[in-house]
């Protein structure tokens, strides 16, 4: 799935259903990027971020050749080669002694599986509060790697909304891949609809309550989804605005 990040949420644009377990391979990912470029143009891509499952020689080579700016997380035990000294080193070794909350950027190129990349990293706490080393590779602008990669959490917001905290797409227990694809496409549209409705209601009708830690009591997507459900399922409900106008591009 390929999405665009916007105000805390990654909105799905394109996806491919895979009739297998595990992650996509590099050919499947490149076909998805090629579809995006054909539809929207390469100039629309500011940068691409992806987690550790989406790293490989052919994939990085494809992004380098296409000159697509990317920030990919790699595993700590990956081997990197200094092209000048021809010495190999584990990725984690380059960040030995890094303090919590700090980042380190290398302004020289390393070889990762034969591809030239820049290396950046930071020692940050994960969602459980445990310090974890985050090592990133990129094609250019390594000084922006850590800050840009933080946008990746927005895809988790999207998946959470599609699954447990919104549409509960997994509860359908569908197995036919074509039906799953059609359902996913409908949910992608509904996700954007719910977000726009929730955003409008939050700004113009009633703001979502802010909790002590500074976050909203519920997401804009869930807020919008509740409003849409009220309009569709409660005949006596009197909405303060027309939720259906957000389905129009005009």
Language-model-derived ranges and their functions:
Residues 5-250:
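Single, function-defining residue in the core of a domain
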